[in-house]
Amino acid sequence: MLGSSRVSKRRPLGAVAALMVVGLTLAGCAGGAPAQNADQGSADSGNITWWGWTPDATPAEAYIKAFNKVYPNIKVTFKKLTIDGYDAAIRPALASSVGPDVFAVAPGAANGSVDIYGVNAVDLKPAVEKTLGADWESKLAPIGVSSLMNGDKLAALSVGSVFSGTIWVNKDLFDKYGLTPPKTYDEWKKVCETFKANNVGCFVQGAAQTAFNEDTLQAITDNVAPGVWEKALKGEVPWTDPAIVQALTIWKKLFDDGIMQEGALGMQQYPDANNGFMSGKYAMVMMGTWYMQYSTIEGNTAAISGAGVADPKPFTQLPIPFPDVAGTGNVGALYGDADFGLAVNQKSKNIAAATTFATWLGTSAEGQQVVADVLNDIPALITTQPNWDTVKLVNPEVQRPALEKLISDSGKSTEPRLATVVADLQTAIGVASTTVAAGEATPEQAAATLQASAAKIK
């Protein structure tokens, strides 16, 4: 029955891609949208390339394997680039005639910005409407639709969303030294003192990769005064607001009190902090829901191996709320965006097959179930949940309740992460984080400089 249901859903998606191609060709002839390649290819066969900085190899292979059970004649080749190298690679590729057929874009001003590269993408609204019906927007997570628009064009289909605000802990290390994950600032300091006394790193952050500093600063600010960070992003309160100054002060204390590791300002979150945590050298790391994938035996083993460990042995990792560092009791805040979207290159010679792949992974029940079960993203199709009976966790009894709660809490969050942060503001926030940490500016001075930069962005 499983195979039959997959085959029965294959033709409608192919038909969607074919119908979309006709519409795109007409639009190009009418002079509305940029003209598409005359040869759009088949919706059910062909060789397509997919570029992205995410997902990791294991999720990507799972997505493609499941897709090929439904579309065996479409070969998908995934090319993973580094986060910092993605823009430099994708920009000339899209300008050429030999770029990828499918490419990743993301909300906001970070790598793969949909605002920048969405102009190179096919409008996927006709394909989604044919697949899900006229009420398609009600079936997909709103944050994944609104944040991947480029003007009036749906430039990409969200595979799923990610949320930050959590710290991930190596439970095995905590258990080994009789420790409990910290809930307050003082507890965090004491935990770090114990780990250091046993020659184990406590908390690790790649503070040189400043987009991830935003996650930590947003968590601290939400702890100080919920909602102020989001209001500052919208320009509703100045960046000199007392809550943000206090957050920068606490940020500095993390460095001064030894919670943040030595040399943090010279480390990247990827690969440095990630590898430090996965190799067992550090017990805690600031990461979001995308880290759920490493809760599985396969995902954890692959990540440990990728961190350079020769004989990887899975460990129990758990998400915990960001500690109550301000002593306010305001804990558990989560903020997120679409993780990434699959965009179809307007210059592709395989637009139909590429659209079939993007539409299947982002909107079909089968595709979204694979996304849910891999635990890399929280699915875009709102009716989809992980099938826990088939998800092989390292320590199901402990991890499953924590992951279920994280997924549930994420679904209730409306606070954005990076989607509303323009490039100049992201740079200014990064400068504030590093100058305060290095002692080159006081929290008050950094907040004033940040506000001055924000005031110029209109």
List PLM regions with ranges.
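Short, well-ordered beta-strand elements
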Residues: 43-55, 74-79, 102, 155, ...
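Hinge/lid segment of periplasmic solute-binding proteins
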Residues: 110-164, 216, 312-320
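Extracytoplasmic "Venus flytrap"/periplasmic binding protein-like
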Residues: 66-140, 176-183, 283-284, 302
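Glycine-centered hinge/linker elements that transmit conformational signals in sensory
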Residues: 194-195, 234-265
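Short, low-complexity disordered leader/linker segments with a strong preference
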Residues: 1-48, 69, 176, 445-448, ...
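Short, solvent-exposed loop/beta-turn-alpha elements that line the ligand-binding surface or hinge
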Residues: 123-140, 224-246, 300, 305-313, ...
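Extracytoplasmic/periplasmic substrate-binding proteins
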Residues: 53, 250-350
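C-terminal capping/gating helix-and-loop segments adjacent to ligand/active sites or protein-protein/ligand interfaces
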Residues: 158, 232, 380-385, 395-453
